């Protein structure tokens, strides 16, 4: 056995005995879906250590290979699939759940925009991350529109920044789609509606990845994640306190609306339609030179 083989075997042994590391967002859909896995309620799964982070940070953690299981944006997959594989469960896809482009209701142009990207020409725009699905959809939708600046902010700070006038527009995700009117903002574009109208496919937002060097088989990990989601559906009350503990939004009705929108049948299994949606998004983006071509297929044997 070579020294590199000894090192690899030692690392695998340490990983097996140390349990699993999981990195997800603190948003209700993630804490709801992964409550059972994180709390040792899925039989046969070693102890799980959880890290919570904003989606832009999660994408960066995956690029550095820091976690065994990690939630990322589908838009980031072209940079991640050499070290990770896509699991067919636990992610966020759906219909009517896309990112929104928001502006102040006080702006005369906002009321007349109705999905016209030209309203953003010369605008200062806040986004949740450069490798997020939200920003990739934004770039496809607003192709040819020259904005003034693009700045990355933690998603929970985008609406206050637009409200305060520091930005002309904000690209929002998560529970922001339920609460933006309270900030005096209006939606000038629903990028999910735009995507569904253009493709007929669901919106591929967040993916769950597993490290390729894990000793567990990918099928076993997918089954464990699927079991966690199924447990959440079977007993929603079990995760309620943990979900509220980590949520940016504490209103129970908003939290429940968030879960209802983002945790669905695609969270149990991507299926043919889920894979087709992700492939279509990344193929369109690669054609426009917005992302590299995928290094390998999303669906692996």
Segment roles from a protein language model:
Residues 153-245:
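Pocket-lining segment of extracytoplasmic ligand-binding domains
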Residues 43-57:
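A short beta-strand-loop structural module common to alpha/beta enzyme folds
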Residues 86-113, 196-213:
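Hydrophobic/proline-rich hinge and linker segments of small-molecule sensing/allosteric domains
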Residues 29, 54-56, 65-78, 154-155, ...:
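Beta->alpha turn/N-cap motifs
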Residues 215-284:
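Secondary-structure end/capping motifs
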Residues 62-63, 162-163, 285:
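Hydrophobic residues within well-ordered alpha-helices
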Residues 21, 84-91, 124-125:
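A structural signal for short loop-to-beta-strand junctions that line the ligand-binding cleft
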Residues 14-39, 53, 99-169, 175, ...:
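Bilobed "Venus flytrap"/periplasmic-binding protein-like clamshell domains
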């Amino acid at each position: 056995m070579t020294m590199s083989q000894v090192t690899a075997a030692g690392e695998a042994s340490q990983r097996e005995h140390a349990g699993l590391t999981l990195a997800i967002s603190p948003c209700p859909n993630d804490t709801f879906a992964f409550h059972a896995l994180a709390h040792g309620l899925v039989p046969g799964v070693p102890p799980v250590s959880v890290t919570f982070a904003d989606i832009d940070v999660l994408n960066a953690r995956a690029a550095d290979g820091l976690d065994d299981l990690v939630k990322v944006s589908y838009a980031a997959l072209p940079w991640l699939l050499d070290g990770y594989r896509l699991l067919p469960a636990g992610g966020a896809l759906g219909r009517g759940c896309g990112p929104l482009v928001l502006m102040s209701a006080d702006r005369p142009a906002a009321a007349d925009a109705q999905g016209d990207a030209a309203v953003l020409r010369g605008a200062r725009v806040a986004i949740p991350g450069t490798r997020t699905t939200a920003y990739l959809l934004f770039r496809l939708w607003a192709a040819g529109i020259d904005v003034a600046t693009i700045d990355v902010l933690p998603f929970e700070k985008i609406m206050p920044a637009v409200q305060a006038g520091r930005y002309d527009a904000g690209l929002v995700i998560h529970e922001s789609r339920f609460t933006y009117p309270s900030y005096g903002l209006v939606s000038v574009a629903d990028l999910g509606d735009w995507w569904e109208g253009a493709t007929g496919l669901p919106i591929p937002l967040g993916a769950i990845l597993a490290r390729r060097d894990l000793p567990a088989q990918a099928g076993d990990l997918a089954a464990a994640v699927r079991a966690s989601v199924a447990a959440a559906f079977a007993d929603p009350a079990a995760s309620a306190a943990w979900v509220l503990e980590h949520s940016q939004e504490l209103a129970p009705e908003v939290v429940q609306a968030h879960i209802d929108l983002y945790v669905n049948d695609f969270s149990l299994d991507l299926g043919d339609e889920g894979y087709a949606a992700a492939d279509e998004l990344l193929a369109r983006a690669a054609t426009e030179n917005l992302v590299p071509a995928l290094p390998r297929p999303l669906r692996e044997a």
